[in-house]
Amino acid sequence: MAADGQCSLPASWRPVTLTHVEYPAGDLSGHLLAYLSLSPVFVIVGFVTLIIFKRELHTISFLGGLALNEGVNWLIKNVIQEPRPCGGPHTAVGTKYGMPSSHSQFMWFFSIYSFLFLYLRMHQTNNARFLDLLWRHVLSLGLLAAAFLVSYSRVYLLYHTWSQVLYGGIAGGLMAIAWFIFTQEVLTPLFPRIAAWPVSEFFLIRDTSLIPNVLWFEYTVTRAEARNRQRKLGTKLQ
């Protein structure tokens, strides 16, 4: 840094474009859509948190699919090299190319994969309760609505054209279907073997593929263990 009282030529400053979203001043809808446009960042933070605390192989695989999807988006953008909307007000963007929209591709991958997971992987339709089915339907609609709103926000905020978000959504959906099939047919049979690796045991990485309802399983196991420890504690105090 320059010493006190001394002037120097201004340095070139650049924003962190990952979380840099601009919207028209005074536009409430644009303000809300700008926050929605940050949904991919929130999703990534959620995945990292889940992996740190759960360390489940399927969650790690899901995040790997999202990373691969981003790589495919970068490749397509640099092959097609279609610019962003002409006359856009934004000076700080991650790349000058806009086809396909990475936000749209990311959210549609996340939503379609989650949709397939809820209806094909969590195969409990024969004994599922009404509230379980209702929760599944509401969550699926919410995911699809989020993907649409994020895609719409990129057009509304003049970061992309409709065709760019449309093809981004198509690419993300196709990638989600392909990655879901690959995970089910190739990776899932390998999960028990991977979970048995010494490095996996060291980092407490686990495989819950054969457990249909992990939330209920963890709840019942935790409750049973807590009661067992309570009984042992009561016996010692007598």
Swiss-Prot record:
One of its GO terms (cellular component) is endoplasmic reticulum membrane. The chain crosses the membrane at residues 33-53, 100-120, 130-150, 162-182. The keyword Endoplasmic reticulum applies. It catalyses: a di-trans,poly-cis-dolichyl diphosphate + H2O = a di-trans,poly-cis-dolichyl phosphate + phosphate + H(+). GO terms for biological process: lipid biosynthetic process; protein N-linked glycosylation. It is found in: Endoplasmic reticulum membrane. The keyword Transmembrane applies. Keywords: Endoplasmic reticulum, Hydrolase, Membrane, Transmembrane, Transmembrane helix. Its EC number is 3.6.1.43. SMART domains: acidPPc (SM00014). It is a multi-pass membrane protein. SUPFAM superfamilies: Acid phosphatase/Vanadium-dependent haloperoxidase (SSF48317). One of its GO terms (molecular function) is dolichyldiphosphatase activity. Pathway: Protein modification; protein glycosylation. Required for efficient N-glycosylation. Necessary for maintaining optimal levels of dolichol-linked oligosaccharides. Hydrolyzes dolichyl pyrophosphate at a very high rate and dolichyl monophosphate at a much lower rate. Does not act on phosphatidate. Belongs to the dolichyldiphosphatase family. PANTHER family: DOLICHYLDIPHOSPHATASE 1, PALMITOYL-PROTEIN THIOESTERASE/DOLICHYLDIPHOSPHATASE 1. This is Dolichyldiphosphatase 1. It comes from Papio anubis (Olive baboon).
